[in-house]
Amino acid sequence: MSIELDWTGLEKSFADSLCERLNAALADMDMPTFLGPTRVQAIELGSEGPDVQVIHIGHVWREFREAAVHASSASDKYNARATTPPRMPMRLRTFRQYDDNDLPTSVHGGADADSIASEHEESLSRWSDTESETGTCDSSSLWEEQTRLSDIPSLQMHLSVQWLTSTMRLSLTTSLKIAYNNDTIMSLPISLVVTGMELFAQAIVALDGVHRCVYLSLSEDSTEECAPDGLRAVHDARIRTRHQGQRILPFLALESKVGESAKHVLENVGKVERFVGDMLRQWLEDELVYPHFYTLYL
């Protein structure tokens, strides 16, 4: 089922709000040590809207619900010993990446690619077992009762999103820090403008009425028939965990300026633009491609 978007009817206030949210996310993000503060300066959505189709509607995945329960439990433990309550996190990772003693925003590091791949394969095998009562899409009686009592419905939608645009503009600024013996000896200002892109993704949007939040994640898109769990199995699980950022965002057009405008400026530096594109694709894999996801609280 296709969704018609009045893309050109979106007001500037929507783009400004999106800009603020992106800057809030960037402020909380762990950036590479060689990059200075990064900020989105402006967003223009352009005249070419994405093609969006609903391909699946079902129950909220158990992984999402368990992550919310675990985050709530960790937050309660923190509140019991804190004088002021912590700010509700903008982002959550999957349940299995938490430690019982961590706060909701704590994420384990150091896991190698093989362990991540094995976890993903195990998760994919659970999704394919549609006859199992303990599969990802199961609904416990307690969950069903809580859902009925909530004034917000609980459901999960999978959307096929294809966005080919050359009219959008996203301007951001950052700096390249050059260090010697752990001391920054030089900082080069960098201005970047995204002038076009091709995005092919399956957006996973889960509305959780019990915990009053929305889970957002991405997966690869495909023309293959949708599986009962909502994901389109287009690749072997061992391949699916690698280079997804490149397949989701195969094309990204950038314009760059390196240096201070009052002094010498280098424009359209190819190596910088390729590096930024690779870093953005890696960010997609590390932050948004399932099993990673964002949680927005209502």
From Swiss-Prot:
The SMP-LTD domain is a barrel-like domain that can bind various types of glycerophospholipids in its interior and mediate their transfer between two adjacent bilayers. Its main location: mitochondrion. The keyword Coiled coil does not apply. It comes from the Eukaryota. One of its GO terms (molecular function) is lipid binding. Component of the ERMES/MDM complex, which serves as a molecular tether to connect the endoplasmic reticulum (ER) and mitochondria. Components of this complex are involved in the control of mitochondrial shape and protein biogenesis, and function in nonvesicular lipid trafficking between the ER and mitochondria. MDM12 is required for the interaction of the ER-resident membrane protein MMM1 and the outer mitochondrial membrane-resident beta-barrel protein MDM10. GO terms for cellular component: endoplasmic reticulum membrane; ERMES complex. GO terms for biological process: mitochondrial genome maintenance; mitochondrion-endoplasmic reticulum membrane tethering; phospholipid transport; protein insertion into mitochondrial outer membrane. Keywords: Endoplasmic reticulum, Lipid transport, Lipid-binding, Membrane, Mitochondrion, Mitochondrion outer membrane, Transport. Residues 1-298 form the SMP-LTD domain. The gene is MDM12. InterPro entries: Mdm12, SMP_LBD. Transmembrane segments: none annotated. Component of the ER-mitochondria encounter structure (ERMES) or MDM complex, composed of MMM1, MDM10, MDM12 and MDM34. A MMM1 homodimer associates with one molecule of MDM12 on each side in a pairwise head-to-tail manner, and the SMP-LTD domains of MMM1 and MDM12 generate a continuous hydrophobic tunnel for phospholipid trafficking. It is found in: Mitochondrion outer membrane; Endoplasmic reticulum membrane. It is a peripheral membrane protein. Belongs to the MDM12 family. The lineage of its organism: Eukaryota, Fungi, Dikarya, Basidiomycota, Ustilaginomycotina. PROSITE patterns: SMP. Coiled coil: none annotated. This is Mitochondrial distribution and morphology protein 12. Residues 118-142 are annotated as: Disordered. Residues 133-142 have a biased composition (Polar residues).
